Amino acid sequence: MKKCKLAAMAWLSVCIVLFTSCGNSAGVSAGSTSEVKSTAVSESTAEEKQPYEILREKEDETKQIAADEEQQVKELQDALNAVNFYYEEFDGGDALMGVSPNCENNEKQGKSCIVPVICVFGPSVDPIACIGFDYIGDTYLDMDTVEIDTVNYRYTYGNTTFITDVQKDKLTISPNGDEKTEEAAFRLATEDDLDALVDIVESDEVGLTFAKYNTAKPVFVECEMPEEDRQAITDVLNAYYLYLNASEKVRAKALADISYTEVES
């Protein structure tokens, strides 16, 4: 689809900015604020753990991840194949950018959403995670702030923490052919942001606010996070943590056998 291709090009441009400015460093700091909204904590369930949950826990518990190299390759390939990858060569290197198909489906249906992204530059470099915020409406909002409310916390992201200017576009929504406006912003994911994504997945209710606050006449739009976002975040977290904890050889074998779409420069 044309629009998905345009979005992929935008996301890949973000990856290029990261590669040229950060080199091999995945630990890039970006400002964010997290406000405690409630002290209530929901009880954990006995459901089977996702790979990212295991890998975020104590070191001795990571033994639950397969020790056999070929099994590690298979698990990493499965996680990577749950994400749609886009490949582009650029001056000085190349990159793979991965986004869950759930995010692309949200876009096609005109649903404002969170867009978790994984950027891969090769087996010798740790992956980089990004968070995108995609607002789709009837008119441009000139978005400068995004708020995410979970059961326990409010996460606020201002435009000073975005790594590029807010990108604007127009798209046609299926199946009625309605024309909508789209605004997207991206930021590097810090450790706090990864914690926030886990909180979002685990929260029973998640509200999104897309706002223009840097004005005497503020404008904002509130909506519920699409349910598909939970799977999208889970897909990217699994791919990110499995890749992060894999050896260079396992990474290379997994990357050699995944599908991707080449993006024209």
Task: Briefly describe each language-model feature range.
Residues 1-11:
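Bacterial N-terminal signal peptides that target proteins for export
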Residues 17-21:
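C-terminal motif of bacterial Sec signal peptides marking the signal peptidase cleavage site
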Residues 23-265:
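A generic "folded-domain core" signal
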